[in-house]
Amino acid sequence: STQYPASNKANFHPTIAPWHALAIAAHYQRDNASSHLDTLFTISDQLIDLQSDPEFPGRFFTDKGPNFGNPNVVRDALSTLTLMASLDIATDLGDRKRQKRYRKAIWLALDNLRSLQYDHGVVTSFDQPMKAVGALRFRHNDEMIRLDGVVFGAEVFERAAILIQNGRL
């Protein structure tokens, strides 16, 4: 069987792990089964463990343990998409304990992403401020906007709306 080293704590990195998890979720969605669901849930649980910063609840970063680099919107959005995929599968499987855990973490993550979003009147440092409204800054303390962060962030918000509409979130 294929092994996913990302589920091993020694090999876990929050920049790479979501891609493994999303591949497992896609495999499950395609085949309605996957022999790697334990790995998916382990990765999701490890991501949730990173949401421990009292100053930025919902952000996927902790200064305890290994240095995974500075937090950023791309990692936060991909981690949130991973939790959403895990919630969908946990719901399909009737795993209420995981559903509750993932819902709580997703709401925290959504609050974090929303806090990164530019509102009208907050974007005066840009040449065309109105074009930045709605975009997500790369980091809380950084005015930079990166396309991948905006695109993955938009996907998170769209996915959240679908989960809410379907009564899953």
Question: Can you annotate each of these PLM segments?
Answer:
Residues S1-L169:
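Glycan-recognition and catalytic cores of secretory/periplasmic carbohydrate-active enzymes
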